[in-house]
Amino acid sequence: MFKRITLVGFGLLAGSIAAAVRQKVAIRAVSSKSTLKRAKDLADEFFEYDDVKNWLPGSDLILLCSPIKHIISTIDVLQSNANLLTGEVMVSDIGSTKEEICEKGFALPKPFVFVGGHPMAGSEKHGFEHSDPSIFENAYWLYCLPENLAKLPEPMCELLNFLGSRPVQIAPNDHDFAMAWLSHAPQLLSTSMAAGISPEVVKNHLHLAGRGFRDMTRIAGSSWGMWKDILETNRKNIDEALGIYAQKALEIKSKLDSGLEDDFLLGNETRHSLATGKNYAYPLYEVVANIPDEPGSILKALNPLAAEGINLRDIELMKVREGVGGILLLAFKTENEAESAIKILEDRGIHAVSR
């Protein structure tokens, strides 16, 4: 694995990487002075962005973790300072679009070796204060190789394996096309729901919002600073996807009186084909447990599973009614783990079934 990783930009994902690997790898944090002052527990060395003559030499991996436009400008900085290096240095990034970044990165001169990257992990929260070393566990890490590389270099494979992520190769143009449909346009649809809701509903009835509205508007809380660059660097694909989504919404609106069964069936089929869990690379096996409305009820369900060595991959408290109880959704990697969990919970008087 790499001996020293330089993280340029120190937000949620950079902080999460640092938290996960710091015991095995030396971490250099490159960011603004104000961020560096607050990140003392997550790195070993600290440099401001313009101190490139000190943070560039001696790095095994330079991972660009800032917003997309800053990633692109940092690649220019690396190119201008290649003379500072005496040996090969790998450069990668975590940007949410890939074509513009990879076009720049693949053109870096030796001794740089650039591989485009995009970990399919994150949160509507931002800032390294919310760092989570397990955020990459079982999540895809998409990567783009230049023509002169046949496979992902071994040190990068070791890093991704240590983080628990699942590397998947993809071409930069395929990446941006897919992300427009699966991430970027959905972000705008979520934003349109949250921003376009009736002011009367906001004023008088918003407290009635159920899980459907909350789920669909969750990502509307995302950072504009990050999304501004995404929209600018993937405009063509997003425009196409958003236009077709909008066209379908109008089509559904026009069919309100004539029946929407076929659309519902197609939507059901697409939804059910998704792997369960947060960007997981394989389906998870779900168990639904009924828990009472009393202090410690969640722990009473989870502690026996931990005692038996059964590892949870995902958990969600779905519904709670005061005085009645709630529904706890548990997800497991294997069917055997799910079946064992059901038996353990049932033996302790907690009704549980597979979902």
Language-model-detected regions and their locations in the chain:
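NAD(P)+-binding Rossmann beta1-loop-alpha1 motif at the extreme N-terminus of oxidoreductases
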Residues: 1-54, 61
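Rossmann-like NAD(P)-binding element
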Residues: 52-86, 90
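Glycine-rich, N-terminal phosphate-binding loop of Rossmann-like dinucleotide-binding domains
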Residues: 65-67, 95, 145
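Rossmann-like NAD(P)(H) cofactor-binding subdomain of soluble oxidoreductases
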Residues: 74-129
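Internal alpha-helical scaffold of NAD(P)-dependent oxidoreductase catalytic cores
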Residues: 135-221
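Interdomain hinge/lid region at the active-site interface
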Residues: 202-268, 287, 294
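A conserved regulatory-domain signal marking ACT and ACT-like small-molecule sensing domains
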Residues: 270-355
